[in-house]
Amino acid sequence: VQTLADGHDLTAILKAINKAKKAKSGKPQLIIAKTIIGKGIPEVAGTSKGHGEGGAKFADTARRGLALPEEHFYVSEPVRVYFADHKKRLKRAYGKWKKAFAAWREAHPDRAALLDRAGQQPSAAHLLEKIPLFPADAKLATRAAGRDVIQPIATELPLLISGSADLHGSTLNYIAADKDFEKTNRAGRNLRYGIREHAMAAISNGVAYDGIFRPSCATFLVFADYSRPAMRLAALSKLPVIYIYTHDSIGVGEDGPTHQPVETVSGLRV
């Protein structure tokens, strides 16, 4: 843990970040920077007004308070020089990465072929041919049918990931032919998120961003409320995250009214 008395001291911040990068403990590094909200604007500095009332009307005051030039969109020469050099460093790093990636592809052709399949999904018609058909009068819980459907789909989509908020035993979306993703098995396709619906949905967003994996996650429908902010960001970002919500009946009984999703579907605007 590092504590910076002046969180506005950019040199001190950079020094702390570089120190954290060099840490060998293998543990997360925390930097606590003491700052003043709205610094440089006397009318709002150090008050809650600094959050939403800063606005353009204080721009000139802020420039003077922070000793910045009056010029709009001003970029100092040291910043220009730094980023020009940074661009060169990025190009060198990318060149090294391309060589390493080419060597990896040559050494692991099977894994490279799997990576190339990212984003190349089978058609819906093809997947429909693989999933089981159920009699119309089958006395089968929807989640049990979902369990039987996800297995062949997971075979056809080797980059599909299935997670649950500590409810795999109830949501039944576990990929039976695979194992858990964990420290000693990074190839596992089942993620155990714990009772953390928001974290589950947010992590699924992160997994989806690079377009390689197709994440799915599951919990009871009533707990969609906990994951809704992350779901909203997924919609805004057009991320193809799959949400599986079971126990969707208002007749869910043994857990009582806290688990009955009376208004949840309307809230999700499904």
Where are these regions (language model features)?
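Thiamine diphosphate
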Residues: 3, 80-81, 85-270
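Glycine-rich ThDP/TPP pyrophosphate-binding loop and its adjacent helix/strand module
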Residues: 1-85, 256, 261-265, 269-270
